[in-house]
Amino acid sequence: AASDVYKRQRVQGNLPAMEYYRRKCDFIPAVMEAYESLSREYDVIVIEGAGSPAEINLQENDIVNMGLARMVDAPVLLVGDIDRGGVFAQLYGTVALQSEEDKKRIKGVVVNKFRGDRAILEPGLKMLEQLCGVPVAGVVPYLSVDIDDEDSLSERFGRGREPRLIDIAVIRLPRISNFTDFSPFEHYANVSLRYVERVRDLRAPDMIVLPGTKSTIADLGWLRQSGLEAAIKKAASGGTLVFGVCGGYQMLGRHISDPEQVEAACVTEIDGMGLLPGETVFEGAKVQTQTSGVFSGVEGLLSVLNGKRYAGYEIHMGRSEARGALISAGNVYGSYVHGIFDEQEVTDTILKALCEKRGVSFKALGNFDWKAYKERQYDLLADAVRAGLDMKLIYRILEREV
């Protein structure tokens, strides 16, 4: 196992587990600098832990759970997932395995993803409070809300298998990232969004998408070995719209080089797919920026995007020769901008172009406002969390009264 480590936006390397644990204390000054910068700007900072604070083999020099809470003197809420089962053992065991100092830092426990009548849970909650000596700060129900998943935890990859009026195939790269870029397409009534990892499943989609990846060179190698690269190039030559985002865009170019081994791959250079102009060179500094503007210079089927506004963000290693919000060559397109499909006008315009090419009515796809939908989902989540938590206790914890 290894971890990609970044400090102040610069790559520190792909560190094997033992080397990371040996060096992690070196990163504390950067962690504290980031925290202090945030504390000057915000009244409340929420720190999400990583993994479990009960992993006692990792507690020495910890910088992501209780260790960080100690460094910044933060009170702690311990959250357990009851949907996976064994939540009382999780919460009690986690508290029991803490040092006496860290036990005092835990100000409340929360049961998350509860299904059913809370009254059934009450006897267990009372026993948990007695055993842990920590109040139960709330029970949050299991919610059917549609919010973004973590790349490694998504259950969406199996959805939308049956082609509909417009069929979009996203290549499921082994190290796929930012796949939620394409979520807006899922909500049109007659659009199917499929994740494909085998040539036989590609079929004949209206649009092929190459998504972002945590390792462009390695995933391009996989794409080549799997036969999907050849299948995509054949589809592109037949007129299928191909769209690459971030790492997917880099793959579509002529060449990729990594002289500093930023991606820590055995291969430091590789020929791209050659469907877009330009080359990409990886370098130590990571691009992280928000971006917005108006499309211009777009050619081919998606030339109808010219004059339309876009907004999103870039987060990537490597710089490409060809720059601009959207690079095009025939029916092949590439962009570094994540969130480019969140703008309804952009998504509608692309789907209209696909419908026109196919000779079907755009109205048959249905109408969908992605931004309004996302706001409703987060409002539902916020309302349920607020209703499930003892907010008086939460505010007392924030005010250091507990």
PLM segments and residue spans:
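Flexible phosphate-sensing "switch/lid" loops adjacent to ATP/NTP-binding sites
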Residues: 1-236, 241, 258-261, 284, ...
